Each structure stands twice: as structure tokens, then as C-alpha cells.
């Protein structure tokens, strides 16, 4: 089996060496070259023909944000994984890079000289993402799949049927590819959609608040980062904050449904985890629950969808052709839990159809 060819782009020679050493220790990977900035990387691409590129954001001459669109114009199917920092600026730059076409990101340790932490991040996160992204042939993924956040024109919200909404909650789980998939879905749902929406997007702290703000700018619905005790309202979308599990609880006094956050142990190596949210949704809403599983690595959401299905609820999944990685939705589909398997551009219409079905 051919090794996965990786191009490492970073202006720090120390970073290039550490990334190269850790990746090269994996028998399935081969670092075919390195570059100190985007300009050099673009010059090397035709000769090196990598299967995936890792890209730092802050570099001289041509930084990561300048590099991504150049790469995607000529190599639309080359996955780019950004190296980011856990700062507001890092989050902002990373979300911009994802909107421009980067496939995913990993965050660098914040402590100076944390070489050991960096090696752990590379071995535990980056290698898995490289393998997942390069195994995704994605034959139907268009070169413009990342237009949603920065598209030329806003998406047109769909019309609702005249019948009442049957679903009482829509719960969405998503990971890799989510920053471009969620705007596509939420941007097509109208402001008078008849159920609250709760979202788990695998993201670290700092990122989720900024991401929710961006989603709020492309959707007629009100999108916010959820906070503990918040009451669910129609016309609103609640994004789980990074570093916290989100579940739903019914207020014993008012009967309102509220957000409950905790920092219990990660599930599926994730916090927030879709499984945690989905289990609480199954318990509270039963057959009135609709779960939506979008693009993402791993199997988070599978057990939660089993609970929702067992309670009489409905599961919708994104199809393989339009998923950046068909891990999460694929697990649900392969388990026979999905009532509908739809391309990304039809997910919002599918949500409306199921939510308003009688």
C-alpha cells in the first residue's frame, strides 16, 4: 500500500523538524517535503504531489490565509490541515481558513517550549486527521464546497409547510467539515422554523463562541453559544461551548427545557460529545426528536442515535459524497438508523420535511 504523502509548511524550522519526525515514525506516512512559507509550498506542489498539506497560519511572505485559496484553485481536492493556536485571533484565523477551503485544523500547545505536548498533539490528533482525510475519496464533493460562510450571495431560506411542526427539537452532531456544512444547513432554515435547534460541533474553547457568532450572521435563526441554565426558545440555535458537554433538562417548576453544561470525562475523545446531547434529547423528547448527523471523523453520535431511534425519534444523515469525512454519518447509516441519507445541499429541506411530516 502506498504511503500517504505529506507536505509540511511552517516558518519555524523547529516545528518543521518536530512535525516531520513524528509523522515519519508512522509507517503509513511519508513527509515528502517541507516549506517555510506559502510561496515556497506553491512552488513545490507540482513536483512533490502530496496527498495532504499541513499549513501554519502566521508565516512571512505568504501566510496560511493567503496560501489556502491559491492551493484550492489549482489543487481543489488536496486536503489542507491548519495549525492554529487556542487564542481569539487563532480561532478567527482558523475559521477564515476553513471558510476558504481548508479541511481541518489542530491546535498547538500554548506553553512555550512544550515540545512534548506538541508531539502528543501530532501523534494523537494530526495523524488521525491525515489518515481520515486522505481515505475520503469524496467523488461528489464539489470544488466550491466551502462557499457557505464567505459565499458571494446569502443562502435563500426555504419556505415552511402550512401544517404544524411535529418535531419538538432538532439536535445536530458534526465534526470535521462542520464549519462549512452548518452554514449550508442553518442558512436555509427560516426564522419561523418550529423547533429549537441544539448543536454539538467538535471545537475547542474560544472557537465555539466565534463560530456561533459567524453562524448567526448567515442564518435567519438566532445562533448563540449555549450557557448553563439557558431556556430553549423557538427560532434559536444553541451551540455547545468547547470543553463542555451539553445536555438538556426539564425545569421541574416551569416545565421549560434548559441547557445543562458539565465537564465530565470526554466521550469518544470529545467534549462536547454528540452522544451526551443525543441521549438527553431521546429521554426528553422521544418520538418528537430529530437527530441530524453531519460530516465528521469517528463515531460520536452513534450511541445517541441508537437511543433516539429506540425512543421513537428520527435520524437523518449526510451522504458520503458530500461529507469531508464520512465517519460519524457513516456509522449511523451503517447501523441502519438513518431514515434519510441526503447530500448536504438537501439536508435543510430534509429537516423541514421530517419535522413537519404528519
What kind of feature is each model-predicted range?
Residues 1-7, 13-24, 28, 39-40, ...:
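Conserved acid/base catalytic micro-environments in cytosolic active-site loops
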Residues 36:
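Acidic, two-metal ion nucleic-acid-processing modules in DNA metabolism proteins
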Amino acid at each position: 500500500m502506498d504511503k500517504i504523502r505529506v507536505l509540511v509548511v511552517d516558518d519555524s524550522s523547529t516545528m518543521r523538524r518536530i512535525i516531520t519526525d513524528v509523522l515519519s515514525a508512522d509507517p503509513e506516512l511519508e513527509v515528502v517535503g517541507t516549506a517555510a512559507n506559502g510561496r515556497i509550498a506553491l512552488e513545490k506542489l507540482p513536483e512533490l504531489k502530496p496527498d495532504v498539506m499541513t499549513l501554519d497560519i502566521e508565516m512571512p511572505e505568504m501566510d496560511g490565509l493567503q496560501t489556502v485559496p491559491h492551493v484550492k484553485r489549482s489543487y481543489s481536492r488536496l486536503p489542507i490541515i491548519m495549525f492554529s493556536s487556542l487564542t481569539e485571533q487563532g480561532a478567527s484565523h482558523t475559521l477564515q481558513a476553513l471558510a476558504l477551503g481548508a479541511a481541518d485544523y489542530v491546535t498547538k500547545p500554548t506553553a512555550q517550549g512544550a515540545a512534548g505536548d506538541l508531539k502528543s498533539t501530532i501523534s494523537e490528533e494530526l495523524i488521525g486527521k491525515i489518515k481520515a482525510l486522505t481515505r475520503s475519496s469524496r467523488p461528489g464533493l464539489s470544488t466550491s464546497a466551502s462557499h457557505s460562510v464567505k459565499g458571494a450571495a446569502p443562502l435563500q431560506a426555504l419556505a415552511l409547510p402550512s401544517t404544524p411542526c411535529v418535531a419538538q427539537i432538532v439536535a445536530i452532531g458534526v465534526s470535521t467539515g462542520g464549519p462549512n456544512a452548518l452554514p449550508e444547513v442553518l442558512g436555509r432554515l427560516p426564522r419561523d422554523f418550529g423547533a429549537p435547534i441544539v448543536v454539538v460541533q467538535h471545537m475547542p474553547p474560544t472557537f465555539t463562541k466565534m463560530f456561533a457568532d459567524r453562524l448567526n450572521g448567515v442564518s435567519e435563526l438566532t445562533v448563540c453559544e449555549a450557557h448553563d441554565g439557558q431556556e430553549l426558545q423557538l427560532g434559536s440555535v444553541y451551540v455547545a461551548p468547547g470543553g463542555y458537554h451539553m445536555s438538556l433538562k426539564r425545569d421541574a417548576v416551569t416545565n421549560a427545557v434548559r441547557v445543562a453544561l458539565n465537564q465530565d470525562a470526554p466521550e469518544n475523545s470529545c467534549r462536547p460529545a454528540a452522544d451526551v446531547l443525543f441521549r438527553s434529547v431521546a429521554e426528553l423528547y422521544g418520538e418528537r426528536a430529530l437527530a441530524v448527523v453531519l460530516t465528521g471523523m469517528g463515531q460520536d453520535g452513534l450511541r445517541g442515535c441508537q437511543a433516539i431511534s429506540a425512543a421513537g425519534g428520527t435520524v437523518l444523515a449526510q451522504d458520503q459524497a458530500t461529507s469531508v469525512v464520512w465517519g460519524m454519518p457513516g456509522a449511523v447509516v451503517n447501523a441502519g438508523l438513518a431514515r434519510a441519507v441526503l447530500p448536504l445541499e438537501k439536508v435543510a429541506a430534509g429537516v423541514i420535511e421530517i419535522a413537519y411530516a404528519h
